[in-house]
Curated annotation (Swiss-Prot):
Region of interest (Disordered), residue spans: 72-199
Ranges annotated as biased composition (Basic and acidic residues): 166-183
Residues spanning the membrane: none
Modified residues (Phosphoserine): 21, 76, 100, 103, 113, 135-136, 183, 185, 249
Swiss-Prot/TrEMBL GO biological process terms: positive regulation of cell population proliferation; regulation of DNA-templated transcription
Region (PSIP1-binding): 55-114
Cross-link Glycyl lysine isopeptide (Lys-Gly) (interchain with G-Cter in SUMO2) placement: 210, 213
Matching InterPro entries: CDCA7/CDA7L, Znf-4CXXC_R1
Any Pfam family matching the protein: zf-4CXXC_R1
Identification of the protein by name: Cell division cycle-associated 7-like protein
Extent of motif Integrase domain-binding motif 1 (IBM1): 9-33
Amino acid sequence: MELATRSQIPKEVADIFNAPSDDEEFVGFQDDVPMENLSESCGSLDSLELEKQNACLHSKYFTEELRRIFKEDTDSDNEDFEGFTESELNIGSNPELIESELSDGDKTHPMMSDEEDDDDEEEAAPRRGRQSTRSSFGLRVAFQFPTKKTAKTPDKNSPHLLGGKTDLRREKSCRQPKEKEDSASDAEDESRAESQETSDALLKRAMNIKENKAMLAQLLAELNSVPDFFPVRTPPSASRRRTPRRAFSEGQITRRVNPTRSARPPEKFALENFTFSATKLTEELYSFRRRKTISGGKCQKYRRHRISSFRSVKDITEEELENIAITVRDKVYDKVLGNTCHQCRQKTIDTKTVCRNQGCGGVRGQFCGPCLRNRYGEDVRTALLDPKWTCPPCRGICNCSYCRRRDGRCATGILIHLAKFYGYDNVKEYLESLQKQL
């Protein structure tokens, strides 16, 4: 039985199993199904072929004889296929089988999806099942060899790709202005909303200010309608604020005393502390006691000489005469080296007068050039060169503030401009004219 079945295998079929297939791919094995469901499996296979359009599942070697062999059921599942013998390979010279294979090879698609072919296959299947008495393989293989489709790499310079790129660029360029327009419109909407909010806030503020002003005016009107509730205080007049000026009395004048100043430096200010040694102190005491015993208990008294500013005409030098101040601008102030003027009490370094009276001395007889000319109408140069010249205080005509206060009169102040206005050359003549009028 096994030999009978093997004798039916042609050489071309054996070549299919023995020859290596480089251009064909093995899809897989088909499960064992009974003959009753074979037609249904073939229908499902056809539908699957229609779904997979890109894969070509037909082969030129898939003949009718090969289909019949694989559709037959095996008698025993334990038998294995061990290969083809030489006799089976030589038997393939049967002309009938060769013609059937050639006729089947001319067909491009042996597994057609037409209804007529399906009916023929369903009728031939039970006939082959009855006639076959051999034991076939335990495995049935469905040879479906899809043709390889080489994946064509797209050319970068192809017109289709270039056209697609240009289309994409155009779309992007169209989208960008649209996005800009959308963003600009959004920004305009936001700015309008903000301006609307600010305008609403300003209007609300103006309304509140107006209401507050109206309320304040109403309250002030109500307060003014009740004058007794809030009495209005009249400010005191300026005449009441002024204290009456004390009239100058002709009575006794108190002596002028310098006020006590808290800023006055303490006693012994800026004095150096000289330390004496004990030996020197004992020597001084010893010498003092010795002089006392020698003199008979009486200490020697030295005669005190009063330093006077009296200077003769011969002592006046030409430099001192040139140093006389004619105007106020010629006076140079110096609190260390300068001497004080009796009239203006300013300490300057210019040359001043010297009183020739023996009982006068110090600041009393010193007058600067502007004061002596404006107040008394005299010149410092002639006073220095006159050996008999005496100062105004010694003559009793001094009109300074201290001398007038001592005599019970008030200070005159600056009267030179008023005296010149009335035609007088100095203040002394103007005061004498006033005294005559009284």
